[in-house]
């Protein structure tokens, strides 16, 4: 699957003065850890299920991890970034049935909209953008291996009579399961049931065991599964197989929102451990905060969504939307309010007015300050404050660096993704 077109990202001068290490907070340990090794960096970020794209919660995730890609590249690392798109899954099929739109067309339309939004927000595209459908052969091979190793098993029909032969992972095969978070079994079961799991499925060896292969049902899409029979993949195994194929293990960062920490990342990590015999397939798990609106986390089920495309269509500069996001640390939960957009538009106008002054305080100091902020757990608010301070001083007539405006514009573009 083709990703969107990446923006042109300018190179900055004096790369030797750039921090050579970007540190992020690992969910598993709670500690800051270097991200990137031996001149290379690799990251997997979970992508959209394309049936309602792109709201500010999505944008928050992808803009946040875009900062990491930009910081890595500025530091001279060779970056491999992989993102999936879950282009077949129960929520997509349910939305298609409810609207009378073919599920393939719905997915294609929403993926195209997502791409337009990523282009508008100047998010750097991943090197590999992989759909669940195209990963089916890899999933089949992985599930067959797990069955052969007794790390998976088949179950009989569900209570509705369907699903005879569904394949589930035996989490008992992974002694490290649960090591990513700090949840007890009751908390895991509650979240598993809320987030797509089926703890009460008859025939399972344990309530938390996740689906690997859903055998063919009437009026559902399916694909050849070799010895598994026709069907479609489970959610967690899709990401595990895509990461294994396009990144290998271990890779540096597994990224996504905090709502993916459990069960999705915990279970994908478990599958990778079983398939690769690697204790820590991802060196660090990095999770972004949730965005709320009208008092609740933005969610498709609640319908309290603010769409990037609608903001842009109303005349909002996409760079102001990006600045709304950059005003918050990626790990922060925050609530969107209309006033935030006005503040972001004012900030954008101030930065542009500062560039028009012709000279100002040292641009090199801005580059160093923004780099230092991003190297410290992607501190976007700290980086934005550096630019705010420079802009205020430039407008006040301080400084005589004639090249400052051009230097700052390149830095803000390259590191923060904001085109001035």
From Swiss-Prot:
The keyword Transport does not apply. InterPro entries: Cys-tRNA/MSH_ligase, Mycothiol_ligase_MshC, Rossmann-like_a/b/a_fold, tRNA-synt_1_cat_dom. Binds 1 zinc ion per subunit. It comes from the Bacteria. Its cofactor is Zn(2+). A motif ('ERGGDP' region) lies at residues 194-199. It catalyses: 1D-myo-inositol 2-amino-2-deoxy-alpha-D-glucopyranoside + L-cysteine + ATP = 1D-myo-inositol 2-(L-cysteinylamino)-2-deoxy-alpha-D-glucopyranoside + AMP + diphosphate + H(+). Its EC number is 6.3.1.13. Disulfide bonds: none annotated. A motif ('HIGH' region) lies at residues 48-58. GO terms for biological process: cysteinyl-tRNA aminoacylation; mycothiol biosynthetic process. GO terms for cellular component: cytosol. Pfam families: tRNA-synt_1e. It is an enzyme of class 6 (ligase). GO terms for molecular function: ATP binding; cysteine-glucosaminylinositol ligase activity; cysteine-tRNA ligase activity; zinc ion binding. Keywords: ATP-binding, Ligase, Metal-binding, Nucleotide-binding, Zinc. A motif ('KMSKS' region) lies at residues 297-301. The keyword Protein transport does not apply. Zn(2+) binds at residues 46, 239, 264. Monomer. Catalyzes the ATP-dependent condensation of GlcN-Ins and L-cysteine to form L-Cys-GlcN-Ins. PANTHER family: CYSTEINE--TRNA LIGASE, CYTOPLASMIC (PTHR10890:SF3), CYSTEINYL-TRNA SYNTHETASE (PTHR10890). Belongs to the class-I aminoacyl-tRNA synthetase family. MshC subfamily. This is L-cysteine:1D-myo-inositol 2-amino-2-deoxy-alpha-D-glucopyranoside ligase. The gene is mshC.
């Amino acid at each position: 699957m083709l990703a969107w077109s990446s923006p042109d990202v300018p190179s900055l001068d004096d790369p030797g003065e750039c921090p050579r290490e970007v540190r992020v907070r690992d969910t598993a340990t709670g500690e800051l850890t270097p991200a990137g090794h031996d001149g290379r960096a690799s990251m997997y970020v979970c992508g959209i299920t394309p049936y309602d794209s792109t709201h500010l919660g999505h944008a928050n995730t992808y803009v946040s991890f875009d900062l990491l890609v930009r910081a890595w590249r500025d530091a001279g690392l060779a970056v491999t970034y992989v993102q999936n798109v879950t282009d077949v899954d129960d929520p997509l099929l349910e939305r298609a049935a409810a609207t009378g739109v073919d599920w393939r067309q719905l997915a294609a339309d929403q993926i195209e909209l997502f791409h337009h939004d990523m282009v508008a927000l100047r998010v750097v595209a991943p090197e590999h953008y992989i759909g669940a459908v195209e990963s089916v052969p890899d999933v089949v091979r992985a599930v067959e291996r797990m069955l052969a190793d007794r790390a998976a098993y088949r179950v009989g029909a569900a209570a509705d009579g369907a699903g005879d032969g569904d394949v589930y992972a035996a989490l008992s095969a992974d002694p490290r399961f649960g090591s990513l978070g700090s949840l007890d079994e009751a908390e895991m079961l509650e979240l598993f049931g809320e987030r797509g799991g089926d703890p009460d499925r008859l025939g399972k060896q344990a309530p938390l065991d996740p689906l690997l292969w859903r055998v063919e049902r009437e009026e559902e899409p399916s694909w050849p599964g070799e010895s598994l029979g026709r069907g479609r993949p489970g959610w967690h195994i899709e990401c595990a197989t895509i990461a294994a194929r396009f990144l290998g293990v271990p890779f540096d960062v597994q990224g996504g929102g905090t709502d993916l920490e459990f069960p999705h990342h915990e279970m994908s990590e478990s599958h990778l451990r079983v398939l690769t015999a690697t204790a820590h397939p991802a060196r660090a798990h990095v999770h972004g905060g949730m965005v709320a609106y009208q008092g609740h986390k933005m969610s498709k089920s609640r319908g309290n969504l603010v769409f990037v495309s609608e903001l842009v269509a109303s005349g909002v500069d996409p760079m102001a939307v990006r600045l709304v996001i950059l005003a918050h640390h990626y790990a922060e939960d925050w609530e969107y309010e209309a006033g935030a957009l006005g503040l972001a538009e004012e900030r954008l106008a101030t930065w542009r007015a500062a560039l028009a002054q012709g000279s100002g305080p040292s641009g090199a100091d801005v580059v160093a300050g923004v780099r230092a902020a991003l190297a410290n757990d992607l501190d976007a608010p700290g980086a934005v404050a550096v630019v705010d301070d420079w802009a205020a001083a430039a407008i006040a007539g301080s400084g005589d660096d004639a090249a400052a405006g051009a230097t700052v514009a390149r830095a803000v573009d390259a590191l923060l993704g904001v085109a001035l």
